[in-house]
């Protein structure tokens, strides 16, 4: 057993077996087992209660996973048969280009379990797991492909305001922040155990994002997390130590949202002072202030390089910025019901009007052609950057109440980028641009998750 299980795992298994033998009223067998495995640890009522039912749960989990694997194998076999019998011409006709896919009603899944409004959602970068946070103080982990609840994560004492997956390569973590003034880190590989709590903010922590690798000049790539708070500050944390390594001040009021650039060099924040601000993540110095909204700015996002060509055309530029550069364009959404697109120097490029209530979430389409927004008017709107930002699609009644959050499933990453590469499969030198564009399209996952005051999380997928 020692060759398969660690000492800790073996001890946990022994406790679960002893608890199970107690449940089925087999004290002699339990005593014999304890003697056989030389189990001398105390086993009081609290320990017994903790481990009762664990063995049965593990067993049913294995059966459930076996069933899921079987279903996936059958589905894969069916799809492969269909693919083998389909000609390339008809395949192109039947399958929509993922770079042009937009969400449509009805949702594939409506996920129900939260008891209070949903405030945030986040996709696991690899697995089909989705985290949702709520004012009910819990985080729910879902399988978004199957539409099933996997577990409920508890630990915060007030509403959960944001969640995000990220962290060091090969060691994905889930981060959450709350009105209880704390940030918590959870380990998905260990049943979402709370591995660290980060105190330090003096008011509600509104938003968190893992900072992509290589940020802030840190040699420990992927270890940084940025948070935004009602205490008017941004804080940068090292998740390996739990220490705050930088506090960024400049906003005059509640900071509602924060978004890092793809390379981690820049941080974009905004909030109740009706401004958005771009910061150098390494020095904490302000690069630019975006002025123009007439109400609180609820959400911000930095445009990915794949959208540069379309945004440069929208801005009237002769040629787009190099794909290796970051924070060239940004978008902001406000309670004034508008979305504004800016260049990285603070020049307003376009104002998108159409929502009838607060704009609560923004995401750039991974294909680079669209900007999507979610609003308290219950809709999702899709804006075409190649058509002067015209609204080309509205998902009406996406929810029955205010849509509070929206995230796009991250692209499937097949190969690590080489030096000079930007995300979404594009290269700085353009040597293999066509090949990279095809690879980027193939990696797009046409899946969006939204959360709402109506207590529902919805999955929109192709």
From Swiss-Prot:
<feature type="compositionally biased region" description="Polar residues">
    <location>
        <begin position="78"/>
        <end position="99"/>
    </location>
</feature>
<dbReference type="InterPro" id="IPR020472">
    <property type="entry name" value="G-protein_beta_WD-40_rep"/>
</dbReference>
<keyword id="KW-0175">Coiled coil</keyword>
<comment type="similarity">
    <text>Belongs to the WD repeat LIS1/nudF family.</text>
</comment>
<keyword id="KW-0493">Microtubule</keyword>
<feature type="repeat" description="WD 7">
    <location>
        <begin position="398"/>
        <end position="445"/>
    </location>
</feature>
<dbReference type="InterPro" id="IPR006594">
    <property type="entry name" value="LisH"/>
</dbReference>
<keyword id="KW-0677">Repeat</keyword>
<feature type="region of interest" description="Disordered">
    <location>
        <begin position="414"/>
        <end position="434"/>
    </location>
</feature>
<dbReference type="GO" id="GO:0047496">
    <property type="term" value="P:vesicle transport along microtubule"/>
</dbReference>
<comment type="subunit">
    <text>Self-associates. Interacts with NDL1 and dynein.</text>
</comment>
<keyword id="KW-0206">Cytoskeleton</keyword>
<dbReference type="GO" id="GO:0051010">
    <property type="term" value="F:microtubule plus-end binding"/>
</dbReference>
<dbReference type="GO" id="GO:0005635">
    <property type="term" value="C:nuclear envelope"/>
</dbReference>
<keyword id="KW-0853">WD repeat</keyword>
<comment type="function">
    <text>Positively regulates the activity of the minus-end directed microtubule motor protein dynein. May enhance dynein-mediated microtubule sliding by targeting dynein to the microtubule plus end. Required for nuclear migration during vegetative growth as well as development. Required for retrograde early endosome (EE) transport from the hyphal tip. Required for localization of dynein to the mitotic spindle poles. Recruits additional proteins to the dynein complex at SPBs.</text>
</comment>
<dbReference type="GO" id="GO:0005881">
    <property type="term" value="C:cytoplasmic microtubule"/>
</dbReference>
<feature type="repeat" description="WD 4">
    <location>
        <begin position="250"/>
        <end position="289"/>
    </location>
</feature>
<dbReference type="GO" id="GO:0007097">
    <property type="term" value="P:nuclear migration"/>
</dbReference>
<dbReference type="GO" id="GO:0005875">
    <property type="term" value="C:microtubule associated complex"/>
</dbReference>
<dbReference type="GO" id="GO:0000922">
    <property type="term" value="C:spindle pole"/>
</dbReference>
<keyword id="KW-0498">Mitosis</keyword>
<dbReference type="GO" id="GO:0000132">
    <property type="term" value="P:establishment of mitotic spindle orientation"/>
</dbReference>
<dbReference type="InterPro" id="IPR037190">
    <property type="entry name" value="LIS1_N"/>
</dbReference>
<dbReference type="GO" id="GO:0000776">
    <property type="term" value="C:kinetochore"/>
</dbReference>
<dbReference type="InterPro" id="IPR015943">
    <property type="entry name" value="WD40/YVTN_repeat-like_dom_sf"/>
</dbReference>
<dbReference type="GO" id="GO:0051301">
    <property type="term" value="P:cell division"/>
</dbReference>
<feature type="repeat" description="WD 8">
    <location>
        <begin position="447"/>
        <end position="462"/>
    </location>
</feature>
<dbReference type="GO" id="GO:0070840">
    <property type="term" value="F:dynein complex binding"/>
</dbReference>
<dbReference type="GO" id="GO:0031023">
    <property type="term" value="P:microtubule organizing center organization"/>
</dbReference>
<dbReference type="InterPro" id="IPR056795">
    <property type="entry name" value="PAC1-like_LisH-like_dom"/>
</dbReference>
<feature type="repeat" description="WD 3">
    <location>
        <begin position="200"/>
        <end position="247"/>
    </location>
</feature>
<keyword id="KW-0963">Cytoplasm</keyword>
<dbReference type="GO" id="GO:0051012">
    <property type="term" value="P:microtubule sliding"/>
</dbReference>
<dbReference type="InterPro" id="IPR036322">
    <property type="entry name" value="WD40_repeat_dom_sf"/>
</dbReference>
<feature type="repeat" description="WD 1">
    <location>
        <begin position="113"/>
        <end position="154"/>
    </location>
</feature>
<feature type="domain" description="LisH">
    <location>
        <begin position="9"/>
        <end position="41"/>
    </location>
</feature>
<dbReference type="InterPro" id="IPR050349">
    <property type="entry name" value="WD_LIS1/nudF_dynein_reg"/>
</dbReference>
<keyword id="KW-0813">Transport</keyword>
<dbReference type="InterPro" id="IPR019775">
    <property type="entry name" value="WD40_repeat_CS"/>
</dbReference>
<dbReference type="Pfam" id="PF24951">
    <property type="entry name" value="LisH_PAC1"/>
</dbReference>
<keyword id="KW-0131">Cell cycle</keyword>
């Amino acid at each position: 057993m020692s060759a398969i299980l660690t000492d800790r795992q073996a001890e946990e298994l022994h406790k679960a077996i002893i608890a199970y033998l107690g449940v089925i009223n087999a004290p002699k067998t339990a005593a014999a087992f304890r003697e056989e495995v030389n189990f001398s640890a105390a086993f009081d009522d609290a320990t017994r209660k903790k481990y009762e039912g664990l063995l049965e749960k593990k067993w049913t989990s294995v059966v459930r996973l076996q069933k899921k694997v079987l279903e996936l194998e059958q589905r894969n076999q069916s799809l492969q048969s269909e693919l083998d019998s389909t000609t390339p011409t008809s395949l192109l006709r039947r399958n929509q280009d993922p770079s042009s896919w937009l969400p449509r009603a009805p949702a594939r899944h409506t996920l129900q379990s939260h008891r209070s409004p949903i405030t945030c959602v986040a996709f696991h970068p690899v697995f089909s797991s989705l985290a949702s946070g709520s004012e009910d103080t819990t985080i729910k982990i879902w399988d978004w492909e199957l539409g099933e609840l996997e577990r409920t994560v508890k630990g915060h004492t007030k509403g959960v305001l944001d969640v995000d997956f990220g962290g060091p390569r090969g060691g994905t973590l889930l981060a959450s922040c709350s009105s209880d003034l704390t940030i918590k880190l959870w380990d998905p590989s260990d049943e979402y155990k709370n591995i660290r709590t980060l105190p330090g903010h003096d008011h509600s922590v509104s938003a968190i994002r893992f900072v992509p690798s290589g940020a802030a000049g840190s040699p420990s790539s992927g270890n940084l997390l940025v948070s935004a708070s009602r205490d008017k500050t941004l804080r940068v944390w090292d998740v390996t130590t739990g220490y705050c390594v930088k506090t960024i001040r400049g906003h005059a009021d509640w900071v509602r949202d924060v978004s890092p650039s793809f390379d981690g060099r820049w941080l974009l924040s905004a909030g109740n002072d009706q401004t958005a601000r771009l910061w150098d993540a390494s020095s904490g110095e302000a690069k630019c202030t975006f002025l123009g909204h007439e109400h609180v700015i609820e959400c911000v996002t930095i445009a990915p390089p794949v959208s540069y060509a379309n945004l440069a055309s929208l801005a009237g530029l002769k040629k787009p910025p190099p794909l290796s550069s970051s924070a060239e364009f940004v978008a902001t959404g406000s309670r004034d019901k508008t979305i504004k697109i800016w260049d990285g120097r603070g020049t307003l490029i376009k104002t998108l009007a159409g929502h009838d209530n607060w704009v609560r979430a923004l995401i750039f389409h991974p294909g680079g052609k669209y900007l999507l927004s979610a609003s308290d008017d219950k809709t999702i709107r899709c804006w075409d950057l190649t058509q002067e930002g015209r609204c080309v699609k509205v998902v009406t009644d996406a929810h029955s109440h205010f849509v509070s959050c929206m995230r796009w499933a991250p692209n499937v990453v097949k190969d690590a980028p080489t030096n000079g590469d930007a995300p979404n499969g594009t290269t700085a030198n353009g040597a293999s641009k066509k090949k990279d564009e095809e690879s980027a399209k193939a990696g797009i996952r046409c899946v969006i998750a939204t959360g709402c005051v109506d207590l529902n999380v919805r999955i929109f997928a192709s």
